């Protein structure tokens, strides 16, 4: 009976999403408690699914009366269970921050729960068409959440993401259609068998199908050069939304790419189509370098870490394309670790903005003196992003690099060595901007401004987004530069009147909400702890890797 947990992980948040709107007709402020209860339930369900996978291995559930491959199938294995746990934990943790930072309102929490349900569905679905359905649920709710700030800048960023995301979803759907024409099935496992038995890896329909699916998911993941929606969306979204989107949305799209590549098309398809794998490696390598360089050019903290994501997902893309077991292990570890790191970093940036109005590196002078816990957590998470051992960021990069070298030594040519070199160069760029931030935290001489309120918390549900105003022109260009008009006018966040829920000035270090600080510190502790779990992670993902490389 444990297989019923799989539909529950999806149904609970989606059904709960109707309640804030329905009960909101009679009661105010019911959205947060409903969302908290629902996401807590999802955490429990995800933990139970992971425990079942640990004890008994992969299991599945057929939805409805039709059995697979005709019916809808949900599947839990080591990879999907790990991603589901990440989704559940980050979703619940984000609510603790949104309670004080916003956005607020019943419609926001309904959209948030739909997002959680869509992400859970992407992690568990066993067929390609339902992957598209859940991908669309995630996309539509993300567009709404990014625009929850109700400013012109956030609305523009949301519209930009909507256009790009729609193109990506359309390409994915066309690719699935081609695969269906070639195989006559949508079930992932059955399609893998039909490709081998009927179509073959050299079938033009199969090749076009994979190319279109990869292109569509690359838009969703935000690989260079189709990354342009991401910096604006991350910068202009409310802080709580940025944290959950950065940690989960691109992460689940990258998970979908791993799942489609290795469960449906298999490693043999990659070996038989050198042109496709070469193109993937070129795009991934370019994304690694371009994202790192553009991140190093930024002053706005959210924009800097947004470009960093372009580089980090490029590493995951390279790990997928290398078709090497060690590299794929690194890609999966980096997928989970990067999600946690970016959640913590954006949560830390939002906490600084809420407590002190800090949004740019130059405004973060001596943050360690006035906000030692917040600054320390951001510094540790930043070093994890660089890949300093023993962080989880180091583990992922190490496995990818070792796998890349193994690939070259096994006769794959110089591509693997090139990937390892690009990752090394990217690490140097990452160190440059993280070190610049840490230098401002610990060695600059001017204290924090200490502003609170609407502008300080930029985009927490009121009518401002980092002082951007209602002019979308400030975010129209994506040339790797900051486009924050307010910051250019003043150079620092001006103190404003406090709002309800904002912390009041005191002599206590880190005058920020205790809940958000606690979540930040726990996230930091988890990322550091995972850095010591290299063998445990390799053992956990071992059965999945053994299956796909058998």
Task: State each model region's role.
Residues 1-15, 76-87, 128-141, 207-219, ...:
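Structural signature of hydrophobic alpha-helical transmembrane segments
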Residues 2, 64-82, 193-210, 273-278, ...:
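Short aromatic-rich membrane-water interface segments that cap or initiate transmembrane helices
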Residues 2-96, 100-110, 461-479, 483-488, ...:
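Transmembrane helix-loop-helix hairpins at membrane boundaries of multipass inner-membrane proteins
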Residues 9-13, 38, 87, 112, ...:
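Residue-level recognition of transmembrane alpha-helices
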Residues 23, 27-30, 107-110, 114, ...:
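Alpha-helical multi-pass transmembrane bundles of energy-transducing inner-membrane proteins
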Residues 65, 213-279, 306:
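Short helix-boundary/re-entrant hairpin motifs in multi-pass inner-membrane proteins
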Residues 108-118, 156-173, 190-213, 232-250, ...:
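Interfacial and helix-entry/exit segments of alpha-helical transmembrane bundles
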Residues 237, 371, 436-550:
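Cytoplasmic/organellar membrane-interface segments at the starts of transmembrane helices
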């Amino acid at each position: 009976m444990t297989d019923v947990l799989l539909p529950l992980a999806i149904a609970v948040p989606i059904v709960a999403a109707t309640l804030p709107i329905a009960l909101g007709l009679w009661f105010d402020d019911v959205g947060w408690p409903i969302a908290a209860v629902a996401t807590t339930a999802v955490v429990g369900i995800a933990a139970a699914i992971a425990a079942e996978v640990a004890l008994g291995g992969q299991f599945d559930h057929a939805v409805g009366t039709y059995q697979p491959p005709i019916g809808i199938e949900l599947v839990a294995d080591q990879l999907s269970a790990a991603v589901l746990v990440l989704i559940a934990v980050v979703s619940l943790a984000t609510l603790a921050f949104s309670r004080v930072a916003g956005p607020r309102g019943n419609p926001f929490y309904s959209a948030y729960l739909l997002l959680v349900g869509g992400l859970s569905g992407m992690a568990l679905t066993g067929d390609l068409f339902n992957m598209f359905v859940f991908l669309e649920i995630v996309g539509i709710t993300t567009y709404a959440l990014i625009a929850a700030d109700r400013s012109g800048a956030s609305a523009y960023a949301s519209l930009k993401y909507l256009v790009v995301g729609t193109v990506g979803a359309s390409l994915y759907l066309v690719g699935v259609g081609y695969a269906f024409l070639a195989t006559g099935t949508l079930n992932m496992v059955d399609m893998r068998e039909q490709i081998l038995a009927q179509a073959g890896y050299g079938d033009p329909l199969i090749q076009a199908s994979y190319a279109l699916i990869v292109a569509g998911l690359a838009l969703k993941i935000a690989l260079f050069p189709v990354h342009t929606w991401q910096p604006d969306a991350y910068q202009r979204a409310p802080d709580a939304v940025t944290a959950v989107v950065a940690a989960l949305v691109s992460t689940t799209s990258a998970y979908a790419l791993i799942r489609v590549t290795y469960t449906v098309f298999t490693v043999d398809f990659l070996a038989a189509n050198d042109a496709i794998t070469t193109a993937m490696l070129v795009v991934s390598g370019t994304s690694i370098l371009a994202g790192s360089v553009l991140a190093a050019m930024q002053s706005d903290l959210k924009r800097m870490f947004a470009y960093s994501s372009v580089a980090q997902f490029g590493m995951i893309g390279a790990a997928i394309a290398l078709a090497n077991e060690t590299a794929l292990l690194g890609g999966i570890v980096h997928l989970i670790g990067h999600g946690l790191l970016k959640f913590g970093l954006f949560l830390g940036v939002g906490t600084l903005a809420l407590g002190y109005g800090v949004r740019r590196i130059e405004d973060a002078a001596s943050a360690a003196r006035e906000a030692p816990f917040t600054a320390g957590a951001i510094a540790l998470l930043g070093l994890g992003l660089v890949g300093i051992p023993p962080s989880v960021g180091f583990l992922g990069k190490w496995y990818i690099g070792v796998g890349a070298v193994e690939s070259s030594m096994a006769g794959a040519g110089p591509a693997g060595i090139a990937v390892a070199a690009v990752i090394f160069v990217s690490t140097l760029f990452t160190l440059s901007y993280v070190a610049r931030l840490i230098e401002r935290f610990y060695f600059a001489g001017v204290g924090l401004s200490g502003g609170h309120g609407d502008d300080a918390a930029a985009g927490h549900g009121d009518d401002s987004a980092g002082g951007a105003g209602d002019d979308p022109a400030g975010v129209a260009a994506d040339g790797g530069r900051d486009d924050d008009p307010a910051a250019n006018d003043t150079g620092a966040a001006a103190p404003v009147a406090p709002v309800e829920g904002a912390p009041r000035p005191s002599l206590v270090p880190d005058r920020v909400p205790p809940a958000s600080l606690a979540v930040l510190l726990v996230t930091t502790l988890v990322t550091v702890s995972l850095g010591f779990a290299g063998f445990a992670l390799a053992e956990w993902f071992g059965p999945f890797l053994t299956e796909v490389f058998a």
